[in-house]
């Protein structure tokens, strides 16, 4: 045993890398209230004031600065500080806060476009290296893409794919750095490498190469930390070191990679063990414990990546998805709520509301009531928290999983994900009606589909064609994803993050869908109303609708059952096709903010949505159609089965404060009851916004009045001022429930 482990109860974790066992043996469940919490220290105030000044300057400029000379890497940059005298946790991606990295490994053209957008130019040397000598992920992907994939991508059926940006959604077990130190982790990886024996064929050769890269990455992380004067070769000795060591593990990931989602994992309960030991030994006070957490969170709030304009259309508001998964319940029935669960959420008060880190509460009916009420209060005050159903994820992933990006569960350090963007199911329906021809470009996208020529659309005929399109697109989607992730592993491998995984990991292939509610409502309109297509040159470009129809979002099984059938069908079709590295097929109903861009690529649909108008986000009902109140809307979404959508079912829920009650305590209790009822039905995810539409309209027109206004959008939170006008208008047009 290491001397740094004195005071901890031993177990399997002392012999093998097993952070879960360490947590289960050592954490202390907290069932009390928030009364112990402390405000920010003077050091924290000074550091945060300087950070806010830089953030506001960045907001005006778009980005603050970029290093155009240095190629991204774990230890490529000199140390950077914000306020060296007052920083309790140190480390930035580059040599200065908010200075962004140029990462050419995903694609040199993308890096150059990103720089050009903000008035910067890549260095001649970097351009030369990645144009003439070093192939990139993007080049590899497009070398291998089939013509069918290129057509579907261009038409906006398969789009937003991680072929032009880092895939992300990989969570290193950064806790391992604090618990074991880098030297022990290197030693364990070397043992693994020596045991990787057998017939030297593709998979074994690749894995041996990857583990060798992981060992080098661990050494680079150690060197990077030493540049800040911190020795992470051995385990952390106290809470401050544990947070710092863990952060260096995460920092290596965001220095090396610019993945779409660079999530943190499940760290609050882990760090609480160190804080409790220090408090018991009189080494720190509660003020100092909160200071460590506040300053750790400040660092996470300042993570940035360089993005293309096209990327910003997909993922609006400059998100990084530093997702932290909080609470949940252990397999033994004890909740994983600790005082540190409160401290993390309390940063939303000490530092003000913010979109990052992406605070995610793993909700269970067995969480302490005091914690449920605290979470609800924080949601009402800050609109910064999302909730995910631990009771349906725990049986699949155990009690040491975390959320990647928005809604995607995986076991920390044991699973990784191949992120797959999404397929536009609303567009697929138009392809079914038009015989596989794109309604906007007039090009053939899906072969062997006859156009529907009836004067009034027949539900059974349309559904038959629609399912044929879904069958074809599922196969094409899997093939496309296989190419992308083969090339990402080859040309943009995440060595630092994968070094903090078990050597033999589970892999999840994360497919997604957009236009879910539009597709369901459109089929409902065809079935229950009379829908006549309007054609130009044989292509349906509009619809005339007679009569009404049931709309998804009103707890009406006539249409909700159609919605469920769609996801079940697409999930089943995906699973018929083999995946790269035998990854498990998963599916999400999640759009991020790409529902606006997808809408621009999608023609008029039978439900009455007009050409170019946004789709609804995630699994949400279409804007304004959930007329029966908040509970009916939630009930519809709760019917979408997690069993066929294990990558997540995203629901963004906005309610005006008065609908929850006229008194603060009443609002808290009502919100707890709403979430209890929703998750009790097996629903998966809920973004919670408690605010008035008028506030957002005023913020759009007077942004200076609301410099830190944070809202939940689709699986993440965003600073409202960072959204484009199109995205702001789309958010404002969503349903704000005025009654339960």
Curated annotation (Swiss-Prot):
Catalytic activity: formate + acetyl-CoA = pyruvate + CoA
GO cellular component, as recorded: cytosol
Annotated keywords: Acyltransferase, Carbohydrate metabolism, Cytoplasm, Glucose metabolism, Organic radical, Transferase
Protein's cellular compartments: Cytoplasm
Active site, renumbered: 405 (s-acetylcysteine intermediate), 406 (cysteine radical intermediate)
A Gene Ontology biological process term: glucose metabolic process
Secretion signal span: none
EC code(s) of this entry: 2.3.1.54
Keyword Nucleotide-binding (UniProt): no
Residues covered by the PFL domain: 1-610
GO molecular function: formate C-acetyltransferase activity
Domain Glycine radical: 617-740
Pathway recorded for this protein: Fermentation; pyruvate fermentation; formate from pyruvate: step 1/1
Glycine radical carried by residues: 715
InterPro entries the UniProt entry points to: Auton_GlycylRad_Cofactor (IPR050244), Form_AcTrfase (IPR005949), Form_AcTrfase_GR_CS (IPR019777), Gly_radical (IPR001150), PFL_dom (IPR004184)
Family named by the database record: Belongs to the glycyl radical enzyme (GRE) family. PFL subfamily.
Subunit structure: Homodimer.
Entries under PANTHER family matching the protein: FORMATE ACETYLTRANSFERASE, FORMATE ACETYLTRANSFERASE 1
Comment field (misc): Several mechanisms have been proposed based on complexes formed with substrate analogs. After activation by the glycine radical, the cysteine radical, Cys-406, can abstract hydrogen atoms from the other active site cysteine, Cys-405, and from coenzyme A, and it can also transfer hydrogen atoms to product radicals. The other active site cysteine can attack the central carbonyl of pyruvate and covalently bind the product acetyl group.
Name the UniProt record assigns to this protein: Formate acetyltransferase
Gene behind the chain: pfl
């Amino acid at each position: 045993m290491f001397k740094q482990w004195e005071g901890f109860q031993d177990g399997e974790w002392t012999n093998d890398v097993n952070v879960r066992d360490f947590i289960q043996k050592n954490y202390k469940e907290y069932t009390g209230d928030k009364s112990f919490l402390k405000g920010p220290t003077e050091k924290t105030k000074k550091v945060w004031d300087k950070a806010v000044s830089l953030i506001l300057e960045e907001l005006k400029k778009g980005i603050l600065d970029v290093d155009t000379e240095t190629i991204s890497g774990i230890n490529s940059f000199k140390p950077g500080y914000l306020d060296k005298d007052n920083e309790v946790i140190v480390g930035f991606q580059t040599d200065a806060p908010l200075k962004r990295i140029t990462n050419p490994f995903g694609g040199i053209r993308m890096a150059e476009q990103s720089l050009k957008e903000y008035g910067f130019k890549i260095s001649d040397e970097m351009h030369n290296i990645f144009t003439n000598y070093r192939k990139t992920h993007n080049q590899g992907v497009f070398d291998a893409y089939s013509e069918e994939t290129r057509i579907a991508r261009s038409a906006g059926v398969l789009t937003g794919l991680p072929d032009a940006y880092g895939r992300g959604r990989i969570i290193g077990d950064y806790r391992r750095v604090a618990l074991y130190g880098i030297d022990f982790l290197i030693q364990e990886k070397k043992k693994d490498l020596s045991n990787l024996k057998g017939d030297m064929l593709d998979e074994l050769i690749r894995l041996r190469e990857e583990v060798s890269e992981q060992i080098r990455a661990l050494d680079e992380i150690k060197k990077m930390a030493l540049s800040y004067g911190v020795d992470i070769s051995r385990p952390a000795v106290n809470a401050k070191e544990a947070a710092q060591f863990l952060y260096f593990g995460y920092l290596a990931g965001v220095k090396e990679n610019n993945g779409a989602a660079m999530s943190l994992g499940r760290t609050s309960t882990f760090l609480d063990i160190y804080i409790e030991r220090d408090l018991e030994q009189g080494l720190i006070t509660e003020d100092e414990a909160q200071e460590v957490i506040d300053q750790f969170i400040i660092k996470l709030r300042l993570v940035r990546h360089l993005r293309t304009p096209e990327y910003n259309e997909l993922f609006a508001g400059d998100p990084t998805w530093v997702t932290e998964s909080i609470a949940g319940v252990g397999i033994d029935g004890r909740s994983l709520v600790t005082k540190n669960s409160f401290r993390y959420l309390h940063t939303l008060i000490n530092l003000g509301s913010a979109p990052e880190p992406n605070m995610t509460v793993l909700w269970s009916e067995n969480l302490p009531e005091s914690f449920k009420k605290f979470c609800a209060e924080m949601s009402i005050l800050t609109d910064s928290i999302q909730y995910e159903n631990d009771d349906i994820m725990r049986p699949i992933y155990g009690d040491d999983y975390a959320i990647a990006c928005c809604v995607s569960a995986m076991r920390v350090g044991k699973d990784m994900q191949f992120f797959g963007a999404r397929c536009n199911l609303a567009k697929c329906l138009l392809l079914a009606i038009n015989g596989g021809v794109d309604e906007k470009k007039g090009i053939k996208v899906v072969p062997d589909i006859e156009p529907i020529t009836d004067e009034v659309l027949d539900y059974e005929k349309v559904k038959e064609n629609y399912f044929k399109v879904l069958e074809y697109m599922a196969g094409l989607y899997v093939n496309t994803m296989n190419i992308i992730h083969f090339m990402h592993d080859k040309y943009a491998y995440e060595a630092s993050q994968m070094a903090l995984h078990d050597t033999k990991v589970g892999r999840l292939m994360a497919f997604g869908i957009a236009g879910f509610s539009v597709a369901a409502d459109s089929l409902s309109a065809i079935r229950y109303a009379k829908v006549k297509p309007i054609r130009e040159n044989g292509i349906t470009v509009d619809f005339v609708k007679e009569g009404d129809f049931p709309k998804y979002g009103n707890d009406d099984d006539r249409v909700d059952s159609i919605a469920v059938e769609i996801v079940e069908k697409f999930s089943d079709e995906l699973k018929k096709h083999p995946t790269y590295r035998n990854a498990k097929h998963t599916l999400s109903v999640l759009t991020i903010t790409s529902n606006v861009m997808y809408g621009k690529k999608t023609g008029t649909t039978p439900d009455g949505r007009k050409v170019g108008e946004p789709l609804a986000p995630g699994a949400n009902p279409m804007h304004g159609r959930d007329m029966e109140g908040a509970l009916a809307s939630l009930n519809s979404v709760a019917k979408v089965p997690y069993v066929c959508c294990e990558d997540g079912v995203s629901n963004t829920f906005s309610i005006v404060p008065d609908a929850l009650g006229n008194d603060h305590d009443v609002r808290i209790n009502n919100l707890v009851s709403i979430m209890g009822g929703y998750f009790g039905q097996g629903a998966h995810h809920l973004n919670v916004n408690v605010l008035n539409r008028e506030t957002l309209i005023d913020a759009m027109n007077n942004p200076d009045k609301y410099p830190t206004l944070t809202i939940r959008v689709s699986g993440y939170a965003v600073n409202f001022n960072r959204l484009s006008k199109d995205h702001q208008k789309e958010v404002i047009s969503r349903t704000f429930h005025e009654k339960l």
